[in-house]
UniProtKB/Swiss-Prot annotation:
The keyword Zinc applies. Keywords: DNA recombination, DNA-binding, Metal-binding, Transposition, Zinc. Pfam families: Cas12f1-like_TNB, HTH_OrfB_IS605. One of its GO terms (molecular function) is DNA binding. PANTHER family: PTHR36172, RESOLVASE-RELATED. It comes from Paramecium bursaria Chlorella virus 1 (PBCV-1). Zn(2+) binds at C375, C378, C393, C395. This is Putative transposase A625R. Induction: Expressed in the late phase of the viral replicative cycle. The keyword DNA-binding applies. GO terms for biological process: DNA recombination; transposition. InterPro entries: Cas12f1-like_TNB, Recombinase/Transposase-rel, Transposase_put_HTH. In the N-terminal section; belongs to the transposase 2 family. In the C-terminal section; belongs to the transposase 35 family. NCBIfam families: guided_TnpB.
Length: 432
């Protein structure tokens, strides 16, 4: 016996007649946003010399040691997780009263690292403790244990060094930490002239590339009048979109094909590495494997930003439900899991959220329960849907599964109180 979905209501029955199935010049959303300044990070690729790379590695070791010393002091309860207290204990050689800090008695090598880098590492430890205690107070976690940073993890995953505002860019010349690094070569353009507006960082990624992270202030737009769009995240179809004007499309299928090809090549290299006996050849193949992973990440990022640009330019609001990757991965096969994890739905969602905030667009994360199985015409649940690509209902509704789910996400959100103002706008646009 057929059954109505839990969120289907009388309002849903009215809205499903209002929301068109085909593209129409109606149902736009007036998005009034107060203009404000938001902080966004821009990446500039650096090309340091061999000597500068070695200096950065030494600075990273000193920053890691300072971080671990601060964590150890708080864990042993010899110091409180306070920035000023930890800074006085582990940063300066000479105190204000003229005495020398005993911490540096056998650790003079730390003084070779610039003070801003060690200071940011100590502040990072204090901020981590503050976040952990806040989560504990809000009962988000039951307990926590602050662990140390390891050299192995740093060599494998890279590092990030805070350099504050100790850099300048004039006439195409970038100087970072003048007393240590000096002039550093870079690719592209630097988003500031003179001194930066906020504290910057130097990052080394897992693939050995160095980046300068520059925070930049941007002003949001004040008003947009365009349709809103609901996005259904998935694996076979990464992003299915349905707009309030009836327009629909699927995005990310090309990305899936390219990422699958790269993963296939990685698997082939892995098999060759497992059978190889020559040490030098095995090292070369591991380097080749690392380059493939870097290509995988760059292809994914390029498609992410292309899709985000396409959506944010065409619509004034985005409805993007969270995709529970961890829960879904338990029910899928290994090959499908690799495809799902390669899409990086969480990273895409965070990027979309930041871009919507930057452009002053509506962004919300509604729930998506029963949106795939529910008929968008009669509200009945189709228990026989399974993994079918096409949705079919006894009422005669036949539609693409993912597009239909995206339409139901939009319909479900408009049926809630949060979408009440949007519904009024829709009705006004229909009557005018």
């Amino acid at each position: 016996m057929s059954k109505l979905t839990p969120w289907w209501s009388r309002k849903s029955q009215q809205l499903t007649k209002i929301i068109p199935w085909g593209t129409e010049n109606v149902n736009t959303f007036q998005n009034d946003v107060i203009a404000k300044r938001v902080l966004r990070t821009r990446k500039v690729k650096l090309n340091p010399t061999k000597q500068q790379k070695m200096m950065l590695m030494k600075f990273a070791d000193a920053a890691r040691y300072s971080y671990n010393a601060a964590v150890s002091a708080v864990n042993d309860k010899t110091h409180n997780p306070n920035k000023i207290e930890l800074q006085n204990a582990f940063l300066s050689l000479k105190r204000r009263d003229g005495t020398y800090n005993k911490f540096f008695q056998k650790r003079r090598w730390l003084l070779g690292c610039p003070q801003p880098i060690r200071q940011q590492a100590i502040f990072e430890a204090a901020n981590n403790f503050k976040s952990a205690f806040t989560n504990l107070k809000n009962k988000n976690i039951d307990h926590f244990k602050m662990t140390y940073k390891t050299k192995k993890h740093q060599r494998k995953c890279g590092f990030s060094l805070g350099i504050g505002t100790h850099l300048k860019h004039n006439d195409g010349v970038l100087i970072i930490l003048p007393r240590n690094l000096g002039q550093v070569r870079y690719f592209g353009s630097v988003p500031f002239e003179g001194k930066p507006d906020a504290e910057c960082r130097i990052q080394r990624d897992p693939y050995g590339d160095h980046w300068l992270l520059v925070p930049v202030y941007k002003t949001t737009k004040t008003q947009t009048t365009k349709p809103i769009v609901a996005i259904d995240p998935g694996v076979r179809t990464p992003f299915a979109c349905f707009g309030s004007n009836g327009g629909s499309k699927t995005l990310g299928e090309d990305m899936n094909a390219k990422l699958t090809d790269i993963r296939t090549r990685v698997s082939l290299v892995d098999r060759r590495i497992s059978k190889c006996q020559d040490v030098s050849l095995k090292r070369k193949m591991r380097e080749h494997r690392r380059r493939l992973f870097r290509k995988h990440q760059r292809v994914r990022d390029a498609y992410h930003w292309e899709i985000i640009k396409d959506i944010t330019n065409e619509y004034s609001g985005v409805l993007l439900p969270p995709f529970e990757t961890q829960r879904v991965s338990r029910m899928l096969k290994n090959k499908t899991n690799c495809s799902m994890l390669g899409i990086s739905h969480f990273t895409f969602r965070m990027r979309m959220k930041g871009k919507c905030e930057e452009k002053g667009l509506l962004y919300t994360e509604p729930t998506e329960e029963y949106t795939s199985k529910t008929c968008g015409v009669c509200g009945q649940i189709n228990y026989l849907l399974g993994s079918k690509k096409t949705f079919e209902c006894f009422c005669g509704n036949v539609c693409d599964r993912d597009i239909h789910a995206a339409r139901n996400i939009l319909l479900k959100w408009l049926s809630t109180e949060a979408g009440a103002r949007v519904v009024e706008t829709f009705l006004a646009s229909r009557s005018s």
